[in-house]
Amino acid sequence: MDQKILWAVNKMPKTDDKNLPIMGLEEIKKARTFHKSFPQYSETPLTKLPHMASYLGVKEVYVKDESYRFGLNAFKVLGGSFAMARYIAKETGKDVSELPYSVLTSEQLRKEFGQATFFTATDGNHGRGVAWAANRLGQKAVVHMPKGTTQTRLQNIAKEGAQVDIQELNYDDCVRLAAKEADETPRGVIVQDTAWDGYEEIPAWIMQGYGTMAMEVGEQLKAQGCERPTHIFVQAGVGSLAGAVVGYFSNLYADNLPTFVVVEAEAAACLYKGAAAGESGAAPFGALAAMMTMDEYKDLRNDIGLDENSKVLLFSTEGDTDPDRYKNIVWKGLDK
């Protein structure tokens, strides 16, 4: 492992946990029920890796594999689709539990709600999920992608019937463009997994959608004889996935919390810098492997209690969503 792990233990004082209800068990049950109403729904697998656990020196390792999700090879569709359902529910004065797939795609709802245009910015998976959901629910989608995005990712989104383009902008500027266009378009809605002041409701709904994955995991762990993982490793991303995972499992295991380890690449280390400052390069598996096999991380292991009794949960959030780039990285060792 060429890059060093930079780490900080979050020692911020506990608050009143005012945001935990967002990922409350009953709220996430609604998201799970909604996703189960799709004819394409099936649980993604949770795989136990006993040989890897033995190699790393921990008791158990489990990996949730999202490469099977809705045929899109990534978990992101869970968030965008549920956010759309919550938006339609709000606009029609209904509870989202009243809007399963069969109702959302009905002629009656089309007459009642009509059609909205959902705008988003994406590097690939989130936008594809929004486009897929809009297509299935009879809505419109407009997707902006930043410079450097591959044609494969653009084509995957275009196949779902969305209006999609690659802008000569970075990701953050694409988000601003999508938000501006949504504001200027009649019945335009921005569906983004990044929150900012004044835009927090839809990102919270997206997090709840991700909760479907977490709820599946809780049930699957129990079915495999694991009442509770001791450590949960999760990718930071823009924060929505990590927030969803930590929020859900903090509710599920409220009486005996696991240790949560949020991992992000050094090039986008916003959460690390925030934790190190006292404010609110490796993928999680690479970080776990380094922690358990390299002497220089002994203090880190001790700090978070990783040892031979640990039961570790990780998330593989996508498969080969861009097959050519995937082969270059995984098979050929290239960086793109």
Descriptions of predicted regions:
Residues 1-336:
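PLP-dependent amino-acid enzyme catalytic core
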